[in-house]
């Protein structure tokens, strides 16, 4: 049974959408899935955030984990609620309404979604057997118009990240590999804050981060000067936050 409610004669659907962000060393990427629909007798394909409806017998967090696994194959990730989206204009696009009503087999006037955010290492395996959804990573700069208000949800997720890392920067290290270079970390900061970072000043900033630990290991097989690797030490980080 799907969670829904009647407001007057209108049906309101409760939904979960997940913004999953990864970093490939050069670009921020968002996990999207395929949407197949029919409009004016023609089949179309576009993209949307992984999301679906909540069942009556599950709580919000359970629904988010289930939805993400069923649509992408990713499980056991840290998902956090960051905002609810319930504008009446969410169902202003006839294409979206028609797709939703076919899926629900019922007339829908309103849809409210609780958005979840997760930042993961981009090498997480996606389930390629889920042919219908074809989950894939798309560079943030390459994302086109998505279903419903999903472009807005992604924009709000980035705003939330910028605010959150001001007092909890450990969130960013969830995107990095176990060992990373100062350049990778700097590029990540630039992408998150959408502004250039001075290289020299950034190295000074790293030196002040006790939890960013330099390793003896350096890059190999590179044409340029080999860069030193660093690692994020969560134990040291937790001590500095007390």
Model-derived segments and spans:
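NUDIX/MutT-family hydrolases
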Residues: 11, 113-122, 126-163, 176-183, ...
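Conserved Nudix-box catalytic region and its N-terminal flanking loop in Nudix hydrolases
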Residues: 27-75, 82-88, 163-187
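Single conserved hydrophobic/aromatic residue that forms the stacking wall/gate
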Residues: 1-13
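Short helix-coil junctions and helix-kink-helix linkers
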Residues: 187-196
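Active-site segment of metal-dependent pyrophosphate-handling enzymes
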Residues: 62-65, 69-124, 164-170, 210-213
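Phosphate-/nucleic-acid-contacting segments
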Residues: 197-200, 207-223, 227
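Short beta-strand scaffold segments in enzyme catalytic cores
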Residues: 16-20, 116
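Long, intrinsically disordered, low-complexity Ser/Thr/Pro-rich regulatory/activation regions
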Residues: 112, 216-242
């Amino acid at each position: 049974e799907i969670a829904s409610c009647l407001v007057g004669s209108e049906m309101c659907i409760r939904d979960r959408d997940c913004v999953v962000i990864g970093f490939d060393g050069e670009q921020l990427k968002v996990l999207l899935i395929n949407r197949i629909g029919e409009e004016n007798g023609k089949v179309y394909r576009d993209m949307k955030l992984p999301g679906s409806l909540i069942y009556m017998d599950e709580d919000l967090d359970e629904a988010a984990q289930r939805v993400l696994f069923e649509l992408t194959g990713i499980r056991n990730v840290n998902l956090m609620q960051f905002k609810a989206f319930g504008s009446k204009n969410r169902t202003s696009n006839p294409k979206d309404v028609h797709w939703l009503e076919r899926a629900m087999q019922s007339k829908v006037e309103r849809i409210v979604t609780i958005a979840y955010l997760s930042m993961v290492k981009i090498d997480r395996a996606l389930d390629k057997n889920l042919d219908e959804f074809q989950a894939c990573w798309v560079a943030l700069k390459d994302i086109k118009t998505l279903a419903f208000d999903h472009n807005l949800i992604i924009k709000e997720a980035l705003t939330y990240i910028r605010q959150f890392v001001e007092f909890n920067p450990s969130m960013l290290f969830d995107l990095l590999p176990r060992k990373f270079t100062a350049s990778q970390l700097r590029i990540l900061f630039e992408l998150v804050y959408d502004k250039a970072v001075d290289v020299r000043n950034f190295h000074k900033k790293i030196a002040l981060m006790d939890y960013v630990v330099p390793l003896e290991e350096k890059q190999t097989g590179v044409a340029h000067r080999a860069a030193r690797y660093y690692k994020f030490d969560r134990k040291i980080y937790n001590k500095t936050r007390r």
